[in-house]
């Protein structure tokens, strides 16, 4: 059985930065460190940080006075940010800079009194944080997930209207929604640069190339990871058997029985150790040496806050 690896796969710059912020805070300040929401949507990462003293909470009221608080990579609303400011807390922001870009787009639209439409998945923390950047009562902020949502939507003023997107959406699905928005609201204005992040786009492009060769595609990622779900869905749409797995233990032998080629990729919040474990399990089931496919090179790095820029090896 041939094993192919998608390229790129796994951690993106925003996830790397967010995890480093929590790790460095633990090294510098010691446990406990409070993190609002899972810092990234990966069970292995969250469990590892929890074992080292990170406490994951959903409400600022759960954080004691004088504590260290970190916002997750998904970002938070202005209301949450203001609540944290009102408390005796030391706050570090692990929001992905590419999510912050979308926040700024919404905030600008709010200041101008333009209504805004966000394309995203209801209930996702990134969506909640982005929607929470809009505060102008004279305007409006709306959420759509599909072309059907667009055709049902009514706004106050179609002449002053803009749209943004969640950063981890399906590129193809989002294109369909944007097409519907432009037909429904001809004067709507979009972002100068695509809101779907480079890592999401690159990983979807990579899984498309992977699925062209593999009969079965395994996506390493947690069930609550938006970008990981989109990878599995894309492979399924291409007619392949695709499975979203947290780790090697989730692999069922019948998935790869008599399969000649299996492809492996990982969502942007899944560490490479999990991919290595999956490959090892596939090799136990008859797989050969893993072959990485050619793909787009990624060299983007997002710096941690200057207060946390320390070599953790130097910290006792």
From Swiss-Prot:
Instruction: Mention one GO biological process in which this protein takes part, according to its record.
Output: terpenoid biosynthetic process
The pathway this protein participates in, as annotated, is: Isoprenoid biosynthesis; dimethylallyl diphosphate biosynthesis; dimethylallyl diphosphate from (2E)-4-hydroxy-3-methylbutenyl diphosphate: step 1/1; Isoprenoid biosynthesis; isopentenyl diphosphate biosynthesis via DXP pathway; isopentenyl diphosphate from 1-deoxy-D-xylulose 5-phosphate: step 6/6
The signal sequence is none
Q: Where does isopentenyl diphosphate bind?
A: 41, 74, 124, 225-227, 269
Query: What's in the keyword line of the UniProt record?
Result: 4Fe-4S, Iron, Iron-sulfur, Isoprene biosynthesis, Metal-binding, Oxidoreductase
EC code: 1.17.7.4
Residue positions annotated to bind [4Fe-4S] cluster are 12, 96, 197
Annotated Gene3D superfamilies = 3.40.50.11270, 4-hydroxy-3-methylbut-2-enyl diphosphate reductase, catalytic domain (3.40.1010.20)
Under CDD domains, the record lists: lytB_ispH (cd13944)
Cofactor remark: Binds 1 [4Fe-4S] cluster per subunit.
Where dimethylallyl diphosphate is bound, by residue? Answer: 41, 74, 124, 225-227, 269
Q: What does this protein do?
A: Catalyzes the conversion of 1-hydroxy-2-methyl-2-(E)-butenyl 4-diphosphate (HMBPP) into a mixture of isopentenyl diphosphate (IPP) and dimethylallyl diphosphate (DMAPP). Acts in the terminal step of the DOXP/MEP pathway for isoprenoid precursor biosynthesis.
| Entry protein name | 4-hydroxy-3-methylbut-2-enyl diphosphate reductase
Gene behind the chain: ispH
